[in-house]
Protein backbone atom coordinates (compact mmCIF):
# COMPACT_ATOMS: atom_id res chain seq x y z
CA UNK A 1 0.00 0.00 0.00
CA UNK A 2 1.58 3.31 -1.04
CA UNK A 3 2.10 6.11 1.44
CA UNK A 4 -0.60 8.76 1.70
CA UNK A 5 0.42 12.07 0.12
CA UNK A 6 0.89 15.17 2.22
CA UNK A 7 -2.27 16.95 3.35
CA UNK A 8 -2.85 20.21 1.43
CA UNK A 9 -3.17 22.04 4.76
CA UNK A 10 0.25 20.75 5.86
CA UNK A 11 1.93 21.67 2.57
CA UNK A 12 0.19 25.05 2.73
CA UNK A 13 1.46 25.61 6.25
CA UNK A 14 5.04 24.78 5.25
CA UNK A 15 4.79 26.81 2.02
CA UNK A 16 3.45 29.82 3.93
CA UNK A 17 6.80 30.13 5.71
CA UNK A 18 8.30 31.15 2.33
CA UNK A 19 5.82 33.91 1.51
CA UNK A 20 3.85 36.64 3.22
CA UNK A 21 0.92 36.13 0.83
CA UNK A 22 -2.08 33.90 1.43
CA UNK A 23 -2.16 30.66 -0.54
CA UNK A 24 -5.39 29.59 -2.26
CA UNK A 25 -6.74 26.11 -1.58
CA UNK A 26 -6.35 25.08 -5.23
CA UNK A 27 -2.70 26.15 -5.10
CA UNK A 28 -2.18 24.05 -1.96
CA UNK A 29 -3.66 21.05 -3.82
CA UNK A 30 -1.30 21.69 -6.73
CA UNK A 31 1.65 22.05 -4.36
CA UNK A 32 0.97 18.55 -3.01
CA UNK A 33 1.22 17.14 -6.55
CA UNK A 34 4.32 19.20 -7.32
CA UNK A 35 6.12 18.13 -4.15
CA UNK A 36 5.29 14.47 -4.85
CA UNK A 37 6.51 14.87 -8.45
CA UNK A 38 9.74 16.38 -7.12
CA UNK A 39 10.14 13.33 -4.87
CA UNK A 40 9.60 11.13 -7.95
CA UNK A 41 12.56 12.92 -9.53
CA UNK A 42 14.73 13.18 -6.41
CA UNK A 43 14.54 9.70 -4.87
CA UNK A 44 15.94 7.76 -7.87
CA UNK A 45 18.84 10.24 -8.08
CA UNK A 46 19.52 9.80 -4.37
CA UNK A 47 19.37 6.01 -4.75
CA UNK A 48 21.99 6.06 -7.50
CA UNK A 49 24.25 8.40 -5.52
CA UNK A 50 23.85 6.30 -2.37
CA UNK A 51 24.80 3.09 -4.18
CA UNK A 52 27.67 4.83 -5.98
CA UNK A 53 29.12 5.69 -2.56
CA UNK A 54 28.44 2.26 -1.04
CA UNK A 55 27.12 -0.54 -3.24
CA UNK A 56 26.17 -2.64 -0.19
CA UNK A 57 24.11 0.09 1.47
CA UNK A 58 20.47 -0.77 2.18
CA UNK A 59 19.28 2.65 3.37
CA UNK A 60 18.75 5.74 1.22
CA UNK A 61 21.27 8.42 2.13
CA UNK A 62 22.11 11.98 1.11
CA UNK A 63 25.35 11.47 -0.78
CA UNK A 64 25.80 15.23 -1.17
CA UNK A 65 26.43 15.86 2.50
CA UNK A 66 27.16 14.30 5.82
CA UNK A 67 24.57 15.17 8.41
CA UNK A 68 24.40 14.75 12.13
CA UNK A 69 22.74 11.46 13.00
CA UNK A 70 18.97 11.89 13.45
CA UNK A 71 18.46 9.25 16.15
CA UNK A 72 21.50 10.30 18.17
CA UNK A 73 20.45 13.96 18.02
CA UNK A 74 16.91 13.02 19.07
CA UNK A 75 18.22 11.01 22.04
CA UNK A 76 20.50 13.86 23.09
CA UNK A 77 17.60 16.31 22.87
CA UNK A 78 15.35 13.99 24.92
CA UNK A 79 18.06 13.86 27.62
CA UNK A 80 17.92 17.65 27.87
CA UNK A 81 14.18 18.39 27.92
CA UNK A 82 12.65 19.41 31.24
CA UNK A 83 9.22 20.92 30.61
CA UNK A 84 7.78 18.74 27.82
CA UNK A 85 7.48 14.98 27.50
CA UNK A 86 8.88 14.22 24.06
CA UNK A 87 10.73 15.58 21.04
CA UNK A 88 8.96 15.75 17.67
CA UNK A 89 10.63 15.10 14.34
CA UNK A 90 10.37 18.77 13.33
CA UNK A 91 12.26 19.70 16.51
CA UNK A 92 14.95 17.13 15.72
CA UNK A 93 15.31 18.40 12.16
CA UNK A 94 15.45 21.98 13.41
CA UNK A 95 17.99 20.98 16.04
CA UNK A 96 20.17 19.27 13.44
CA UNK A 97 20.03 22.33 11.16
CA UNK A 98 20.92 24.61 14.08
CA UNK A 99 23.83 22.41 15.19
CA UNK A 100 25.17 22.09 11.64
CA UNK A 101 25.06 25.88 11.21
CA UNK A 102 26.81 26.28 14.57
CA UNK A 103 29.47 23.75 13.54
CA UNK A 104 29.95 25.48 10.19
CA UNK A 105 30.29 28.90 11.81
CA UNK A 106 32.74 27.50 14.37
CA UNK A 107 34.85 25.84 11.66
CA UNK A 108 34.97 29.08 9.64
CA UNK A 109 36.30 30.91 12.70
CA UNK A 110 38.82 28.10 13.31
CA UNK A 111 39.94 28.28 9.67
CA UNK A 112 40.46 32.02 9.94
CA UNK A 113 42.59 31.57 13.07
CA UNK A 114 44.66 28.80 11.44
CA UNK A 115 45.10 30.90 8.29
CA UNK A 116 46.41 33.81 10.35
CA UNK A 117 49.02 31.38 11.75
CA UNK A 118 49.74 30.29 8.17
CA UNK A 119 49.10 26.62 8.94
CA UNK A 120 46.77 24.14 7.27
CA UNK A 121 45.73 22.22 10.39
CA UNK A 122 43.16 23.45 12.89
CA UNK A 123 44.72 23.00 16.31
CA UNK A 124 43.30 23.41 19.83
CA UNK A 125 44.59 26.99 20.03
CA UNK A 126 42.62 27.85 16.89
CA UNK A 127 39.49 26.37 18.46
CA UNK A 128 40.06 28.48 21.58
CA UNK A 129 40.48 31.62 19.46
CA UNK A 130 37.33 30.75 17.49
CA UNK A 131 35.26 30.16 20.62
CA UNK A 132 36.49 33.43 22.10
CA UNK A 133 35.65 35.35 18.92
CA UNK A 134 32.16 33.82 19.00
CA UNK A 135 31.71 34.84 22.65
CA UNK A 136 31.75 31.24 23.88
CA UNK A 137 35.22 31.03 25.40
Task: Give the role of each language-model region.
Residues 1-137:
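Intrinsically disordered, low-complexity terminal regions
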Amino acid sequence: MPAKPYAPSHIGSVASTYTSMRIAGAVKDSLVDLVCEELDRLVPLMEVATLDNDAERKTLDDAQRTRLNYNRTRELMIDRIKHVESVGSAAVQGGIEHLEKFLGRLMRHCEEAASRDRVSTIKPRHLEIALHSMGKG
